[in-house]
Amino acid sequence: MTLISAPRIGIAGITGRLGTLCAEEAGSALVGGLSRTADPQRNITTDPAALAKNCDVVIDVSHASTVPAHAAAFAQAGCAWVLGTTGLDQGAQDAVNAAAQHIPVLQAANFSPALTLFLELARQLGAGLPDYDAEILEVHHRQKLDAPSGTALAIGRAVAEGRGVSFEDVARTDQNGRRPDGAIGFASLRGGQIVGEHDLVLMAADEQITLSHRALDRRVFARGALLAARWLAGRPAGLYTMADALKR
């Protein structure tokens, strides 16, 4: 393994809100970006292969529909891939898993270091309080496309993992009817310009505990993405998480 101390960084989704912040944080390490509209003066292309050939690592904060094409292009180029896009269907996730056989891929629903530790606490709470009702509330800006958020689903998966059960068997996004024992419920709110709020509530008849995270500035995600990119470049092929990057 030969780590790269100053990797050349590309950004897929560079003209979006988070992509723009990632570009600012990357500074002189930025070599170009990927968007739906090319801008040669800014080294922005519409071709993922053209971007990847000039990069050591690409931070991908684009759209779920682009993931299969990006997976193929980045794997072919041998370019490390930091993937923060959420709302993937099974076909897109299969493409990510296949790419990780050839290149290092760090996949995260949320790049916040504090939220990464939140997930570990969620696992511990799930394991330690297996009979408590688990509910997850998430609030985001009105433009967000997926609900529940990828981060909320990651929290639910962490609780299920702590309890040693299949997330798919216990996730409850349909709120009609009596609450099943062992279910993990979700509630989503959309409005205004809220960056991101997540609460995990575990409830029993005589007590409850709430674990909360509030993102106050979207730049925390950009800084986390850059941390992940610099950690990932030069790693062996495989599928990594933000928790791996924080062990640096």
From Swiss-Prot:
Name where it mostly resides.
cytoplasm
Which pathway does the UniProt entry assign to this protein?
Amino-acid biosynthesis; L-lysine biosynthesis via DAP pathway; (S)-tetrahydrodipicolinate from L-aspartate: step 4/4
Where in or outside the cell it occurs: the entry states: Cytoplasm
- GO MF annotation list: 4-hydroxy-tetrahydrodipicolinate reductase; NAD binding; NADP binding; oxidoreductase activity, acting on CH or CH2 groups, NAD or NADP as acceptor
Q: Which SUPFAM superfamilies match?
A: Glyceraldehyde-3-phosphate dehydrogenase-like, C-terminal domain (SSF55347), NAD(P)-binding Rossmann-fold domains (SSF51735)
Q: Nucleotide-binding as a keyword? A: no
Sites binding (S)-2,3,4,5-tetrahydrodipicolinate sit at H141, G150, T151
Q: Reaction(s) catalyzed by this protein?
A: (S)-2,3,4,5-tetrahydrodipicolinate + NAD(+) + H2O = (2S,4S)-4-hydroxy-2,3,4,5-tetrahydrodipicolinate + NADH + H(+); (S)-2,3,4,5-tetrahydrodipicolinate + NADP(+) + H2O = (2S,4S)-4-hydroxy-2,3,4,5-tetrahydrodipicolinate + NADPH + H(+)
GO BP, one annotated term: lysine biosynthetic process via diaminopimelate
Q: Which residues form the active site?
A: H140 (proton donor/acceptor), K144 (proton donor)
One GO CC annotation = cytosol
Residues that hold NAD(+) according to the record:
G13, I14, T15, G16, R17, L18, G84, T85, T86, A108, A109, N110, F111
Residues in coiled coil: none
PANTHER family according to UniProt: 4-HYDROXY-TETRAHYDRODIPICOLINATE REDUCTASE 1, CHLOROPLASTIC-RELATED, DIHYDRODIPICOLINATE REDUCTASE
Which HAMAP family does the entry mention? DapB
This chain belongs to which protein, by name? Answer: 4-hydroxy-tetrahydrodipicolinate reductase
